[in-house]
């Protein structure tokens, strides 16, 4: 995960001080790209331990089209609690846009199903895209999408995915996002008969919050370790049939967890 540590170093070396909506303050750079080849291992950060359970359940929650935190809470995942209303609702965020994007005719488009169809029928298409940035519904979202646009690409039997992320909390959020979209890539490759290729992560405003600077320095002092391997249940053939028990992580030997307060 040298690419990730290089991002942190670049922000510290080149970043500018900026104010933000949370009032915390950041050091920020604009425009950065990382690339992870899944043949080299599953890109789960090793310079601090990550809570894989939260990553998996959040992704399954998105794929369900769910926008209420009750499903997450039932499984001990609390990462969205701060933005939910008293009923647990978050508005038309990721899951809704992925599975139920409103169309011009009064219906809805299941973007994930369309991706699966295109990969099977039109793998060379340049339109295999999922977008979460629905301008007409941003005001109803409790948190507008940070990771908002993905495109799939097939070459030589390998599936790659590029993600554009407009806002990148580089200490807390980015490690989760890397693992989540790498896992989504692996899952979609699995059910479409392709091999997982590269996850390309393109960042807009990549920042470190000022209250995370000590944690970042600690992380940069640690030597990265070998990447683990993610094994999927070979019996699962439908993307929406995956359950938590269908994922097995092998060889994960990270440094200890580093705590940080999320900026809300």
From Swiss-Prot:
Its EC number is 2.1.1.45. The active site is at 146 (nucleophile). It is found in: Cytoplasm. Its main location: cytoplasm. GO terms for molecular function: thymidylate synthase activity. Pathway: Pyrimidine metabolism; dTTP biosynthesis. This is Thymidylate synthase.
């Amino acid at each position: 995960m040298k690419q990730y540590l290089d991002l942190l170093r670049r922000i510290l070396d080149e970043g500018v001080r900026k104010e933000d909506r949370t009032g915390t303050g950041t050091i920020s750079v604009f425009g950065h790209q990382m690339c992870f080849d899944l043949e080299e291992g599953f890109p789960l950060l090793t310079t601090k331990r990550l809570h894989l359970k939260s990553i998996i359940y959040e992704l399954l929650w998105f794929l369900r089209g769910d926008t209420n935190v009750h499903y997450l809470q039932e499984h001990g995942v609390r990462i969205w609690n701060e933005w939910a209303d008293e009923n647990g609702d978050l508005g038309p965020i990721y899951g809704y846009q992925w599975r139920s994007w409103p169309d011009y005719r009064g219906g809805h488009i299941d973007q994930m199903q369309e991706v699966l169809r295109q990969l099977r029928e039109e793998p060379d298409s340049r339109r295999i895209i999922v977008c979460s940035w629905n301008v007409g519904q941003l005001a109803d979202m409790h948190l507008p999408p940070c990771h908002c646009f993905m495109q799939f690409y097939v070459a030589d039997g390998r599936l790659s995915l590029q993600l554009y992320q407009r806002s990148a909390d580089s200490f807390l959020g980015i490690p989760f996002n890397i693992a989540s979209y790498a896992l989504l890539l692996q899952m979609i490759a699995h059910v479409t008969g392709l091999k997982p290729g590269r996850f390309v992560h393109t960042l807009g405003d990549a920042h470190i919050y000022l209250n995370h600077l000590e944690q970042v320095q600690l992380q940069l002092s640690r030597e990265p370790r070998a990447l683990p391997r993610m094994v999927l249940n070979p019996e699962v053939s439908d993307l929406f049939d995956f359950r938590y028990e269908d994922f097995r992580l092998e060889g994960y030997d990270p440094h200890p967890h580093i705590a940080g307060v999320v900026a809300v």
